[in-house]
Amino acid sequence: MGSVRVAIVGVGNCAASLVQGVEYYKDADPDSKVPGLMHVQFGDYHVSDVEFVAAFDVDAKKVGLDLADAIGASENNTIKICDVPNSGVTVQRGHTLDGLGRYYRETIEESAEEPADIVQTLKDRQVDVLVCYLPVGSEDAAKYYAQCAIDAKVAFVNALPVFIAGTKEWADKFTEAGVPIVGDDIKSQVGATITHRVMAKLFEDRGVVLDRTMQLNVGGNMDFKNMLERDRLESKKISKTQAVTSQIRDRDLGADNVHIGPSDYVAWLDDRKWAYVRLEGRAFGDVPLNLEYKLEVWDSPNSAGVIIDAVRAAKIAKDRGVGGPILSASTYFMKSPPVQMEDTKGRAQLEAFIAGEVER
């Protein structure tokens, strides 16, 4: 079936992990279980079929560099898992709009280069899938790139908490244009959101009433520094919260009983994230039952392990001529999909989609 030609907007830590990951797993045996991957072979596409053909950023230290160099430039501080050879892809100047918040502007220098013609570039490079890795709070910028994807007839993977796939207006736009979208807000392989979801569902399934819960996250990357600007966090908090509360059947915990969100920036953590989660409930005889745990992860590789499948799902949909939200992939890969499902059901739907048994 050929390659999956990918463009990236936002060459930060998540992009760095994704680009490294494709190189790291390029020779993985498609018939074996490989640590770190849900699918070595995803339908017709092996990891090695993913090819990066365009990249956009606004950081002066990244624009003009080869993608292989840009992923280690400026404030990027994720773990290095392999060397990446020269890609032949030069990072182009993207469009800023609301993509740079206060802390980004205090930290980086915005490129003085003229912004690229995004739609024309996507067409010229024959891009299959555009991955949106913009900073949290980039509402206008994310929607701008979503429209570019529609105009260029390029599938869109929305990794950030701006509600596009999950809103009727945008879902209709993608459907009418015949362009696939997978979104919104990437759900990491084994991160705070999916473990919290599983624990909340476990309480429900075992007859324990969940009364209140919290999830506190700290990290040392630019994502966490950006999120110190609380005005940019509204959609992020909504996304992380509904991902967990959607697992509680027929009951609203109430806003005062749920606190989920980023909490602070700790520079020495680099791209590591520490999540502290607590669930308080009542078991047999209304006896209190509390669960508390701490999760430590490298944030960006944890995300890349899911995006590597999301881009291939988007390409399969494009190959099949399916436009609009790809519900199976969105449900399993994203925190805020158009339709929330239990993760086991979402996985089953995804496998059915890969096999061609369901349209989307």
Q: What residues fall within each predicted segment?
A:
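Gly/Ser/Thr-rich loops at beta-strand to alpha-helix junctions
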Residues: 10-16, 134-140, 160-166, 187-193, ...
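N-terminal glycine-/serine-/threonine-rich beta1-alpha1-beta2 phosphate-ribose binding loop
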Residues: 1-145, 233-238, 275, 284
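NAD(P)-dependent Rossmann-like dehydrogenase/reductase catalytic/cofactor-binding core
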Residues: 302-360
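Active-site-lining helix/loop region of Rossmann-like oxidoreductase modules
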Residues: 9, 48-51, 62, 69, ...
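Rossmann-fold NAD(P)-binding glycine/threonine-rich loop
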Residues: 135-151, 159-180
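Rossmann-fold dehydrogenase core element
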Residues: 173-186, 207, 211
